[in-house]
């Protein structure tokens, strides 16, 4: 193993730059050359590859986004696209690849590994929806962004005595809504993994109103449905003045938290160690603060689940 490639793919997440930095610096520490691949798998197929140095990753650990940019590619999902990618890797004499991204990115890395090119996955997604790791890079930063936004919304909700629906990201996973909801003391938390009867939500709001509560906060993951549609139903049935805030892509941006920077540094460095050991087809993760790694198949075959105890606690505290 003499040359390592690194790319970011799929949706960006705060801390990706910290992971890139760790990959580059760890590789150079072990006398390896590192090549950055811009624009994800599309850039790999197009040969958008350049050598990286210590200077390439200077002053980036605190920056959100990804200096390598990211893109989605339908062409790469085909065998032809994957062979084009391998041709570019061979052309640049790259021996192993670090892929920073989510589930879809790892599907691509698995395909390359099956075609004989070793890849290691580093989980970077704000959704925290990947099995085999307690946390993904970017989750903590996004969580804190949501908390900060909801705290501000609560100020105006209190002033105007309104019920606010806060829609957050999470198409298939409700970790962001659950963790943020518990952190801000939301009256209701709606996530894809748990179905809640609409009438019970309305009753909880009415109970609060009857005992003098003047405002309420509801956290809703986008996978549950439209915040605007839900808010309309609440207003019609509960007869409470309602407003909706969709946080959108602000959840993906911003300077990463200390936790995300440390996690990204640890996972990025571990990815290089696995490649040096001639391993491929694996994802690095963290469980109970210990670094772990699993095959891509092991990751794909286990469904990510929410913390049932935390969900139960959120229900108990929102009476």
Swiss-Prot record:
Binding site for ADP: 21-25, 154, 185-187, 211, 213-215
Known catalytic reactions: beta-D-fructose 6-phosphate + ATP = beta-D-fructose 1,6-bisphosphate + ADP + H(+)
This enzyme's EC code(s): 2.7.1.11
Pathway(s) served: Carbohydrate degradation; glycolysis; D-glyceraldehyde 3-phosphate and glycerone phosphate from D-glucose: step 3/4
Subcellular location: Cytoplasm
UniProt binding sites for ATP: 11, 72-73, 102-105
Oligomeric form and interacting partners: Homotetramer.
Function: Catalyzes the phosphorylation of D-fructose 6-phosphate to fructose 1,6-bisphosphate by ATP, the first committing step of glycolysis.
Protein source organism: Oceanobacillus iheyensis (strain DSM 14371 / CIP 107618 / JCM 11309 / KCTC 3954 / HTE831)
BP GO annotations: canonical glycolysis; fructose 1,6-bisphosphate metabolic process; fructose 6-phosphate metabolic process
Record bears the keyword Plastid: no
GO molecular function terms attached to this record: 6-phosphofructokinase activity; AMP binding; ATP binding; fructose-6-phosphate binding; identical protein binding; metal ion binding; monosaccharide binding
One Gene Ontology term, aspect cellular component: 6-phosphofructokinase complex
Protein name: ATP-dependent 6-phosphofructokinase
Binding-site residues for Mg(2+), renumbered to this chain: 103
A Pfam family of this chain: PFK
Cited NCBIfam families: PFKA_ATP, PRK03202.1
Enzyme class: transferase
Active site: 127 (proton acceptor)
Cofactor(s) required, per the database record: Mg(2+)
Keywords: Allosteric enzyme, ATP-binding, Cytoplasm, Glycolysis, Kinase, Magnesium, Metal-binding, Nucleotide-binding, Transferase
Binding of substrate, residues: 125-127, 162, 169-171, 222, 243, 249-252
Activation/inhibition comment: Allosterically activated by ADP and other diphosphonucleosides, and allosterically inhibited by phosphoenolpyruvate.
Family: Belongs to the phosphofructokinase type A (PFKA) family. ATP-dependent PFK group I subfamily. Prokaryotic clade 'B1' sub-subfamily.
């Amino acid at each position: 193993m003499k040359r390592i490639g690194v790319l970011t793919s799929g949706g960006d997440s705060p801390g990706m730059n910290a992971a890139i930095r760790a990959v580059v610096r760890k590789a150079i520490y072990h006398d390896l050359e590192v090549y950055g691949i811009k624009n994800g798998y599309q850039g790999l197929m197009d040969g958008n590859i350049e050598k990286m140095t210590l200077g390439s990753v200077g002053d980036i650990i605190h920056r959100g986004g990804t200096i390598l940019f990211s893109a989605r590619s339908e062409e790469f999902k085909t065998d032809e696209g994957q062979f084009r990618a391998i041709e570019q890797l061979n052309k640049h004499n790259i021996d192993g690849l670090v892929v920073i991204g989510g589930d879809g990115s790892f599907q691509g890395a698995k395909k390359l590994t099956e075609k004989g090119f070793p890849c290691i996955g580093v989980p970077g997604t704000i959704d925290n929806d990947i099995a085999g790791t307690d946390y993904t890079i970017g989750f903590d930063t996004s969580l804190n962004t949501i908390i900060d936004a909801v705290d501000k919304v609560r100020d105006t909700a209190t002033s105007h005595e309104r019920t606010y629906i806060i829609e957050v990201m999470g198409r298939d996973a409700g970790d962001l809504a659950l963790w943020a909801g518990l952190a801000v003391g939301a009256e209701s938390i709606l996530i894809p993994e748990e179905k809640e009867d609409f009438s019970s939500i309305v009753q909880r709001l009415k109970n609060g109103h009857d005992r003098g509560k003047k405002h309420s906060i509801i956290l809703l993951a986008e996978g549950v449905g439209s915040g605007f549609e839900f808010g309309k139903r609440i207003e019609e049935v509960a007869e409470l003045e309602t407003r909706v805030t969709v946080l959108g892509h602000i959840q993906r941006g911003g300077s990463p938290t200390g936790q995300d920077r440390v996690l990204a540094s640890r996972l990025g460095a571990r990815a290089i160690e696995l490649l040096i050991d001639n391993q491929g087809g694996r994802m690095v993760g963290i469980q109970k603060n210990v670094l772990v790694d699993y095959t891509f198949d092991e990751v794909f075959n286990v469904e990510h689940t929410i913390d049932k105890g935390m969900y139960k606690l959120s229900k108990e505290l929102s009476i």
